[in-house]
Amino acid sequence: MTTFYTVISWLMVFGYWLLIAGVTLRILMKRRAVPSAMAWLLVIYILPLFGIVAYLSFGELHLGKRRAERAKAMWPSTARWLSELKESQRIFATDYSEVARPLFQLCDRRQGIDGVKGNQLQLLTTTDATLKALIRDIELARHNIEMVFYIWQPGGLVDQVAESLMAAARRGVHCRLMLDSAGSLQFFRSPYPGMMRNAGIEVVEALKVNLFRVFLRRMDLRQHRKVVLIDNYIAYTGSMNMVDPRYFKQDAGVGQWIDLMARMEGPVASTMGIVYACDWEIETGKRILPPPPDVNIMPFEQESGHTIQVIASGPGFPEEMIHQALLTAVYSAREQLIMTTPYFVPSDDLLHAICTAALRGVEVSIIVPRDNDSTMVRWASRSFFSELLEAGVRIYQFEDGLLHTKSVLVDGQLSLVGTVNLDMRSLWLNFEITLVIDDDGFGSDLACVQDDYIARSQLLNAAEWQKRPFWHRIVERLFYFFSPLL
């Protein structure tokens, strides 16, 4: 009997080390970024069983077998749609500013579609303005409304949006609503899903959180886009979730959330529509390709509208597209670079690009919230400040709420606005969307918004920063080591 237990014990020890060795080899064979690989190996060696479970759950990009098959199956029809769209040569821009040209070339080569012109674009700088404009557009909708959001939380003006959407469905407008399962947990626990379905709205819970499937799909892969499409002509996107900040996370101690949204009219709605169609097919298996833009009702003269490129990321989309776009934008800067983000945990490549821009004389400013709703991200962000300050980057800490805007402005001409945070999750994992706008007029509007943020911020003093407590530095470095996992 003793021999039997001895054999069992040795088999368990052998299996234990074999499992660790197997996961280690798997991490090394994935050719992931070195900091990310090292962070995962550290977790596995310090807390082996927890680390292995965590890695298998969150360490690899598992979309799930069914969704992966749908993503693969949808591309032939999507490619045909893009090919047909490219035949409408009049909607595509052919002339770009010097600072924007490299980024638009990258997007064309990697996504197979160039920037579209003839769009009317409006910045909405407050949640009230956005929700009221959206309600008006929903009330005027005639054919179809598509929405996708990470968070939909009932309360305040959001309830008016819901009522307008249900009224639109009742009068015959085809309405689709896709919400992330984790982000919109309160919505799915409320009466609204049933009310909306009864009104005729197709409501989809995207990427359902299911602990029984934890090893079959990565649970922290989230649908992070915020998009509204109306009648294949009007489109919204930006940083705002479907929440009224007066009712959202009031107990978080960070103040009201500050967001920025863009409202567009024109052919860009079709290019955003194909992104929505892909998301819908991946989640439901149903194909809903949008119609091509109506070339008879759009102003195509370059002077009459904005040139916009849509960048989409996530499983099934070109890998590292958002990351490469940001790097290209930063390296294109010659005079000024202003970046706004609520969560600043950049990749090494992006950090070095930002510092290099400052070192070659570009005026670089980063605007982040002073208080953050994520303690881990707040400490991890602070770990990058010393290197940025040494390079000459100006860091502004916003003091009038949680600044949730995600924007980049390069030389007052090239603008990026969308859902992408400057952190690993947005850069490598989630379903995200970003607009690229080549227009100095829009750049001026965005600069005014950023100037307002700066006026409500405190400039971080490099000398004072060096005087922070020693224990702060220890905590910062600890979270810095795990920043590739955040």
UniProtKB/Swiss-Prot annotation:
EC code: 2.7.8.-
Which reaction does this enzyme catalyse, per its entry? 2 a 1,2-diacyl-sn-glycero-3-phospho-(1'-sn-glycerol) = a cardiolipin + glycerol
Q: What domain of life is recorded for the organism?
A: Bacteria
Gene assigned in the entry: clsA
Can you quote a single GO CC term?
plasma membrane
Query: Hey, which family's this protein in?
Result: Belongs to the phospholipase D family. Cardiolipin synthase subfamily. ClsA sub-subfamily.
What Gene3D superfamilies does the entry give?
Endonuclease Chain A
Briefly, what is this protein's role?
Answer: Catalyzes the reversible phosphatidyl group transfer from one phosphatidylglycerol molecule to another to form cardiolipin (CL) (diphosphatidylglycerol) and glycerol.
Signal sequence bounds? none
Where does the record place the catalytic residues?
224, 226, 231, 404, 406, 411
TM segments? Answer: 3-23, 38-58
Question: InterPro entries under this entry?
Answer: Cardiolipin_synthase, CL_synthase_A, CLS_N, PLD-like_dom, PLipase_D/transphosphatidylase
Query: Key word Cell membrane present in the record?
Result: yes
Which BP terms does GO give this entry? Answer: cardiolipin biosynthetic process
What the entry lists under Pfam families is as follows: PLDc_2, PLDc_N
- Protein keywords: Cell inner membrane, Cell membrane, Lipid biosynthesis, Lipid metabolism, Membrane, Phospholipid biosynthesis, Phospholipid metabolism, Repeat, Transferase, Transmembrane, Transmembrane helix
**What is the membrane topology listed in the Swiss-Prot or TrEMBL record?**
Multi-pass membrane protein
Provide any one GO MF term from the record.
Answer: cardiolipin synthase activity
Q: Where is the PLD phosphodiesterase domain?
A: 219-246, 399-426
**HAMAP family associated with the record:** Cardiolipin_synth_ClsA (MF_00190)
Subcellular location(s): the record lists: Cell inner membrane
Name under which the protein is recorded: Cardiolipin synthase A
